[in-house]
Amino acid sequence: MTRRIVYGIGLWLTLAATAMTIASIVQPRWLAYDVEGHGKHGKSVKVSYGLHTLCDSVTGTCRDFPQEEDCRGDSWSFCSRWRTVGFLMSFAVVIELAVLIGYAVVLLGGKQKRDQGWKMISGCLMVAGATSCASMAIVAFLFDHDDRFFPPGWRLDSSWILCTVSWSISILTACGLIGAAIVLPEEGDYELIPEGRM
């Protein structure tokens, strides 16, 4: 049985996880390349990959990514995986927003909704966490295995970290709701009358 305070804490944690997921999608900082310039007139070079944007300090612009020229030849599997990450992260946000609506229904509903609502909310949080975790893992795999990230200077950047923290919070929140439902006693329920007293 879960109480309002448990759902309230879960709501705040889910809001934080959703904000981090949205920030990781919006910021073009999944993978970054930084190299300092050499010599008197050397300029530093910075490149950052977002899920839908590629920013480059040499041109000073950001462009849509991946484009057709990014996906020719051996890069096809990279582009396919990168687009999959974009889809999975968008799907995770949709699930997290559905969970926030679920919290509103459970918190504004009665005791029966609080008694049963944890099943739906924790299940959706697990799915959202697993989806974000898969996205994080695909980007880490591409970082380790794709040739474009072979030169020194590449690193996993802040959006990847936000994604990692977000799915961790989602999974831990789901586990907390499940644990509270199992461990906490019934909330304000009727006391049973012993059979011998009637």
What are these regions (language model features)?
Residues 59-60, 171-173, 197:
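Low-complexity, flexible helical/coil segments
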Residues 1, 47, 182-198:
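Intrinsically disordered cytoplasmic terminal tails of membrane proteins
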Residues 34-41, 104, 112-113, 148, ...:
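Short alpha-helical interface elements
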Residues 1-32, 81-143, 163-185:
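Signature of small four-pass
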Residues 30, 39, 43-51, 120-122, ...:
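Individual transmembrane alpha-helices with interfacial aromatic-anchor signatures
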Residues 1-3, 46, 67-88, 147-163:
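Juxtamembrane membrane-interface segments at transmembrane-helix boundaries in membrane proteins
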Residues 24-86:
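A surface-exposed beta-alpha-beta supersecondary segment
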